[in-house]
């Protein structure tokens, strides 16, 4: 592509010579396009891009989508472009995560698409493993486990095991049961066949300013995939100590609500037309149960001044779902059902009681985790204390 054409599309012109050994044919299809959305992450960006450059699967393109960063992130990206011809940059004004990812999908040329968040870093053989499994099983999605990673106060990591060995290394249809939908979306621990994404029109919701927009993408991909494979390997290190991870801006409070509104719209329209109304209704009930988990996770991340208003919106949505019979309280486990019933009755009172538990010593914190995440989260809390005492 001529340099002027790259400039018109807001993309930095790629360098033809890089550290991976000579001339890179800009017209040959790469095996995989790795999308790296970037916004003001200079502190972690080099570790992220180093892990991309070091992949044992070398025939890849690394598309860095700079979402109007005001720090040194663009300069860091250019450093990598000068050293390695596989790096390109989409340089644009700030428009949010979803729009950035859609721009990356539009630019991608690979047979497969992978995603790497700019504060995380991949295992060196991650992409090679994922693509090998995808080709071996003719899979549309291959997804692995990942490590939770802390760099301070001392470096440590813990395996986040979504897929036990008994679920791995076999072809599944994710929509056949609810299991896959209830796992953390983690779009970045997977690869997707690009023609599968294009055929299903699986894209991101381009909400301006939103930071976390993976729920609708994941749900659509799982709903449409006929062939998916889970692997037990840890694919990357998912950073837990990024100070910018909580929601402190009022315009981002309801981004997760927008994601689930899009899923509900899509199920009732495109998916129902494609797969039938009965199948769409079945997945709609799964969606509501998954939405509860996602909303409770989002609640914890909100700044305190936004929590009651978020719960009020949550209560309104679930009341509407109960009224139109797209959801039944029986779809939730008993402790989740009791929790939601309290929120539906009085969101502000639930929030006040929850904050009391959270600040009431060891027992109060235990009750706080039990209310938010049930026995599983309580056990995880207890384990984390025993590991560090």
Task: List each language-model region with its residue ranges.
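Cell-envelope/extracellular polymer assembly enzymes that use nucleotide-activated donors
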Residues: 30-33, 61, 216
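N-proximal low-complexity "stem/linker" segments adjacent to membrane-targeting elements
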Residues: 4-53
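A conserved acidic beta->alpha catalytic loop
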Residues: 66-75, 95, 117
């Amino acid at each position: 592509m001529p340099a002027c054409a790259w400039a018109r599309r807001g993309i930095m012109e790629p360098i033809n010579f890089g550290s991976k050994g000579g001339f890179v044919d800009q017209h040959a299809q790469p095996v995989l396009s790795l999308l790296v959305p970037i916004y003001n992450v200079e502190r972690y960006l080099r570790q992220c891009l180093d892990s991309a450059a070091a992949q044992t699967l070398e025939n890849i393109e690394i598309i860095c989508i700079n979402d109007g960063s005001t720090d040194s992130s663009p300069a860091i990206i250019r450093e990598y472009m000068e050293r390695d011809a596989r790096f390109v940059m989409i340089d644009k004004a700030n428009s949010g995560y979803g729009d950035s990812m859609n721009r990356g999908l539009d630019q991608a040329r690979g047979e497969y698409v992978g995603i790497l968040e700019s504060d995380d870093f991949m295992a060196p053989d991650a992409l090679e493993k994922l693509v090998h499994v995808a080709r071996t099983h003719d899979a549309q999605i291959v997804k692995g486990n990942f490590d939770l990673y802390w760099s301070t106060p001392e470096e440590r990591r813990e395996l986040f095991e979504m897929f036990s060995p008994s679920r791995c290394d076999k072809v599944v249809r994710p929509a056949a049961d609810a299991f896959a939908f209830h796992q953390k979306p983690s779009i970045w621990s997977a690869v997707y066949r690009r023609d599968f994404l294009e055929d299903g029109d699986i894209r991101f919701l381009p909400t301006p300013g939103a930071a976390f927009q993976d729920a609708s993408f994941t749900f659509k991909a799982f709903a449409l995939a006929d062939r998916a494979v889970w692997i037990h390997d840890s694919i990357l290190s998912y950073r837990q100590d990024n100070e910018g991870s909580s929601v402190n801006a009022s315009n981002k409070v309801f981004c997760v609500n927008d994601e689930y509104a899009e899923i509900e719209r899509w199920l009732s329209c495109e998916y129902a037309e494609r797969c039938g109304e009965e199948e769409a209704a079945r997945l709609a009930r799964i969606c509501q149960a998954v939405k509860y988990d996602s909303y409770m996770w989002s609640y914890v991340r909100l700044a305190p001044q936004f929590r009651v208003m978020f719960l009020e919106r949550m209560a309104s949505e679930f009341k509407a779902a109960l009224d139109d019979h797209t959801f039944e309280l029986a779809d939730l486990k008993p402790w989740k059902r009791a929790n939601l019933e309290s929120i539906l009755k009085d969101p502000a009172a639930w929030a006040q009681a929850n904050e009391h538990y959270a600040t009431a010593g060891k027992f109060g914190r235990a009750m706080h985790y039990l209310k938010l995440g049930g026995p599983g989260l309580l056990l995880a809390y207890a384990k984390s204390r025993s590991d560090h005492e």
